[in-house]
Amino acid sequence: MKRRQILGAALLVPLHGLAQTCGVITPRQTEGPFFSPNSPLRASLLEGGEKSRLILSGVVLTPDCKPVPNALLDFWHSDEQGAYDNRGFRYRGHQHADAQGRYRLETIVPAEYPGRTRHIHVKVQAPRGRILTTQVYFPGDPGNKRDGLYLPELEMKQAKAGEGVFDFVVNV
């Protein structure tokens, strides 16, 4: 194959699949003290009036780059002031990946709070698989350097303003 053909073929690779390297299981991170079970089934956590909207999307994959259909993703994060809703389900929800392992979450950009940079918690589970609990971080956030839990490999890739991409790699 000629160099030009290889470069041209590389341009055909979708953005999903570039966000996380297959073969490497997404690193586990702490659940933290604010997880609440039984979140509502919903792909949008928006409740109206929010200013810093975010669309986070990606694919749930196996280590050999196969999509994980119907994977369960449970998301939660702080609000615009860095507080978690511990009585209800504001900025909490779960969804299932589609037949190609894709997910799409509409939410806000959460605030940082003392000791923590901006992040989104997530539990990912393949059907009948183990739960992977982790966190997704924002690229270039100044708080990343101060956060002892931050891992650069858990940064979402910025697709464009207000959109991020992160692919999860899980064992099935």
Which residues does each predicted region cover?
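N-terminal secretory signal peptides and thylakoid transit peptides that target proteins
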Residues: 1-13
